[in-house]
From Swiss-Prot:
UniProt protein name: Antigen peptide transporter 2
Domain notes: The peptide-binding site is shared between the cytoplasmic loops of TAP1 and TAP2. The nucleotide-binding domain (NBD) mediates ATP hydrolysis coupled to peptide translocation. Two ATP molecules are accommodated at distinct nucleotide binding sites (NBS) at TAP1-TAP2 dimer interface. Each NBS is formed by Walker A (GxxGxGKST) and Q-loop motifs from NBD of one subunit, while the NBD from the second subunit completes the active site by contributing the C loop motif (LSGGQ). Each ATP molecule is coordinated via the beta- and gamma-phosphates to a Mg2+ ion, which is necessary for ATP hydrolysis.
Positions of the ABC transmembrane type-1 domain: 152-435
Cytoplasmic side: 28-56, 120-148, 209-266, 315-374, 430-703
Region described as Part of the peptide-binding site: 301-389, 414-433
Described function: ABC transporter associated with antigen processing. In complex with TAP1 mediates unidirectional translocation of peptide antigens from cytosol to endoplasmic reticulum (ER) for loading onto MHC class I (MHCI) molecules. Uses the chemical energy of ATP to export peptides against the concentration gradient. During the transport cycle alternates between 'inward-facing' state with peptide binding site facing the cytosol to 'outward-facing' state with peptide binding site facing the ER lumen.
Topology feature Lumenal, residues: 1-6, 78-98, 170-187, 288-293, 396-408
Gene Ontology BP terms: antigen processing and presentation of endogenous peptide antigen via MHC class I; antigen processing and presentation of endogenous peptide antigen via MHC class I via ER pathway, TAP-dependent; antigen processing and presentation of endogenous peptide antigen via MHC class Ib via ER pathway, TAP-dependent; antigen processing and presentation of exogenous protein antigen via MHC class Ib, TAP-dependent; cytosol to endoplasmic reticulum transport; peptide antigen transport; peptide transport; positive regulation of antigen processing and presentation of peptide antigen via MHC class I
Organism the protein comes from: Rattus norvegicus (Rat)
Domain of life: Eukaryota
Lineage of the species this protein comes from: Eukaryota, Metazoa, Chordata, Craniata, Vertebrata
Topological relation to the membrane, as annotated: Multi-pass membrane protein
GO molecular function: ABC-type peptide antigen transporter activity; ABC-type peptide transporter activity; ADP binding; ATP binding; ATP hydrolysis activity; identical protein binding; metal ion binding; MHC class I protein binding
GO cellular component, one term: membrane
Family the UniProt entry places it in: Belongs to the ABC transporter superfamily. ABCB family. MHC peptide exporter (TC 3.A.1.209) subfamily.
């Protein structure tokens, strides 16, 4: 709560004083005497202040404390009246009270405000406007659960049955006590015991079926959310993955989706069960003793006030824990994924220290969460114990007055204890539900994100020549728009020709390959394939016709066949072997135990570097592409394999772009393009350059 804004508090004070002045006049004489008039006065103050502050746009800043300001007086005198003869039952209306009483009322609000400001986490109030979106998120979660509606209906039916059975058990427990305490009636005693057993068995069976139905629905919802999120992530643009850490994405896919699926099956389940049971239990409590029931209701404001202080702190620390766990997971993935590099540089201890620091941050947050939760539970328990003592005191008075039997008081205490338990469940599950809705907000932000990509094309001609034209192409990465990577590139890749693209590191060679695969869009100029803009081609068609083999090929866990036929449907074994033969991979595949069905391990860890390159080339060739891009992908191949690749290229006049660093590659090229600082270097300029790439091209020209 922001204490630095006096305007809303001054407005609240002036409006309240004006309203009290009206209630002190003839309007106040219309209110009934005693407690009903006191409650009517408080309710009237609350409604008028709430409406006026909402119209004035100030409700968000001071609305939390309106119930405290308006209802403290009725609650106090109601407690005095319900306790009985031990205290006076005369009432004092705020409108007609002395200035000292009014100042005490305002002082209680000021003290509560100070406690709230100290205990609430920083920025809690600023986050409240965003929480208005929780209702929309909950509705969206319900819509997401629509396919599981039959299972949820069954679960809620069993929930209602379990609650119904459970509510009768304390009633018959009280009857047993009354039978044992008075004239013993064997038939009545046997009947009470029978119904206790019947309701207990029925409650247990219904609760088990309820839990099983909710868990089944939860598993289906969880799988559906994960599938949708993973599908959405794979369709994002590359800039998104450059800006978002892998650990964060893994956290969303694992922990956040689980929290989302629990929202209905766990949170809504317990919340609805507790709500229905609280209403039903209060009905039975009213049958036993209305006076004790109204006295027990006074525990609700204290519980809500404690929740108002605890819940924002709990939500804040949970969000910090989510981020800390994601960072710790990121450290593990980086260290394990780059284990060879870690060992090569002897950095094992450094990675252990990084992970220890990340875990220490998690430990601090976990300790803070558990400490605050423990204090909250202690306060709740003390309040519940105090209320039980008060109810026992008043209950004994009613027993002595003959208003309640001993069994009735026992039933009431059992009901009251169960009500307290379910009220705490309502408060706790409300906070937990907000946590899960917060996780849903992050997941939905990914599901709703629209990739910065052009509309998918539809061109899929039966025959493609493979002519590639860069026409004054410029490009800057989305994360660094002020720094151009390519500037005004104009050149043509001809079918049946090999074009070597050379240049120093950072000159834009890999960016040219990325543009040619339609991974990014030029910021200027046009990129044409057979005279048509690249973006107009169908996505799957384009990536069968234009294929890249990288310098460090990426393989996946699975068999040799799975990796060669990756992304293709109904790829026959004969096609796989033909591509492997063209890539000179058939020799080592034939030596494997299961041939093309042999598992190669995670990222192809069971293969040598040269074998990985051959499999990657075979994966490209099996698509029979018209344009092949080799990013120094033949560095680990022998002369025979390179010659086989040249033979494959010349068979159907395919277009080949080779990003080269070796003289041998440049000498075999039909065309050499030199990039420097994102621009093509002309041959006249090349003669004046003294770097290694100019030397390579000059040697090729002289040859």
């Amino acid at each position: 709560m922001a204490l630095s804004h006096p305007r809303p508090w001054a407005s609240l004070l002036l409006v309240d004083l004006a309203l009290l002045g009206l209630l002190q006049s003839s309007l106040g004489t219309l209110l009934p005497p005693g407690l009903p008039g006191l409650w009517l006065e408080g309710t009237l103050r609350l409604g008028v202040l709430w409406g006026l502050l909402k119209v004035g746009g100030l409700l968000r800043l001071v609305g939390t404390f309106l119930p405290l300001l308006c209802l403290t007086n009725p609650l106090f005198f109601s407690l005095r009246a319900l306790v009985g003869s031990t205290m006076s039952t005369s009432v004092v209306r705020v409108a007609s009270a002395s200035w000292g009483w009014l100042l005490a009322d305002y002082g209680a609000v000021a003290l509560s405000l100070a406690v709230w400001a100290v205990l609430s986490p920083a920025g809690a109030q600023e986050k409240e406007p965003g929480q208005e979106n929780n209702r929309a998120l909950m509705i969206r979660l319900l819509r997401l659960s629509k396919p599981d509606l039959p299972f949820l209906i069954v679960a809620f039916i069993f929930l209602a049955m379990a609650v119904w059975w459970e509510m009768f058990i304390p009633h018959y427990s009280g009857r047993v006590i009354d039978i044992l305490g008075g004239d013993f009636d064997p038939d009545a005693f046997a009947s009470a015991i029978f119904f206790m057993c019947l309701f207990s068995v029925g409650s247990s069976l219904s609760a088990g079926c309820r839990g099983g139905s909710f868990l089944f629905a939860e598993s289906r919802i969880n799988l559906r959310i994960r599938e949708q999120l993973f599908s959405s992530l794979l369709r994002q643009d590359l800039a998104f993955f450059q800006e978002t850490k892998t650990g964060e994405l893994n956290s969303r896919l694992s922990s956040d989706t689980s929290l989302m699926s629990q929202w209905l099956s766990l949170n809504a389940n317990i919340l609805l069960r507790s709500l229905v049971k609280v209403v039903g239990l209060y009905y039975f409590m009213l049958q036993v003793s209305p006076r004790l029931t109204f006295l027990s209701l006074l525990d609700l404001p204290l519980t809500i006030a404690a929740e108002k202080v605890y819940n924002p702190r709990h939500q804040a620390v949970l969000k910090e824990i989510q981020d800390a766990v994601a960072k710790a997971g990121q450290v593990v993935r980086e260290a394990v994924g780059g284990l060879q590099t870690v060992r090569s540089f002897g950095a094992e201890e450094q990675e252990v220290r990084r992970y220890k620091e990340a875990l220490e941050r998690c430990r601090q947050l976990w300790w803070r969460r558990d400490l605050e939760k423990s204090l909250y539970l202690v306060i709740q328990r003390v309040m519940a114990l105090g209320m039980q003592v008060l109810i026992l005191n008043v209950g004994v008075q009613q027993i002595l007055a003959g208003e309640v039997t001993r069994g009735g008081l026992l039933s009431f205490l059992l009901y009251q204890e169960e009500v307290g338990h379910h009220v705490q469940n309502l408060v706790y599950m409300y906070g937990d539900m907000l946590s899960n809705v917060g996780a849903a907000e992050k997941v939905f932000s990914y599901l709703d994100r629209r990739p910065n990509l052009p509309n998918p094309g539809t061109l899929a001609p039966p025959r493609l020549e493979g002519r590639v034209e860069f026409q004054d192409v410029s490009f800057s990465y989305p994360s660094r728009p002020e720094k151009p990577v390519l500037q005004g590139l104009t050149f043509t890749l001809h079918p049946g020709k090999v074009t070597a693209l050379v240049g120093p590191n950072g000159s834009g060679k890999s960016t040219v390959a990325a543009l040619l695969q339609n991974l990014y869009q030029p910021t200027g100029g046009q990129l044409l394939l057979d005279g048509e803009p690249l973006v107009q081609y169908d996505h799957h068609y384009l990536h069968r016709q234009v294929v890249l083999v990288g310098q460090e090929p990426v393989l996946f866990s699975g068999s040799v066949k799975d990796n060669i036929a990756y992304g293709l449907r109904d790829c026959e074994d004969a096609q796989v072997m033909a591509a492997a033969q063209a890539a000179c991979a058939d020799d080592f595949i034939g030596e494997m135990t299961n041939g093309i069905n042999t598992e190669i391990g995670e990222k192809g860890s069971q293969l040598a570097v040269g074998q990985k390159q051959r499999l990657a080339i075979a994966r490209a060739l099996v698509r029979n592409p018209r344009v092949l891009i080799l990013d120094e992908a033949t560095s680990a191949l022998d002369a025979e394999c390179e010659q086989a690749l040249q033979t494959w290229r010349s068979q159907e006049d395919r277009t080949m772009l080779v990003i080269a660093h070796r003289l041998h590659t440049v000498q075999n090229a039909d065309q050499v393009l030199v990039l420097k600082q994102g621009q093509l270097v002309e041959h006249d300029q090349l003669r004046d350059e003294q770097d290694v790439y100019a030397h390579l091209v000059q040697q090729r020209l002289e040859a």
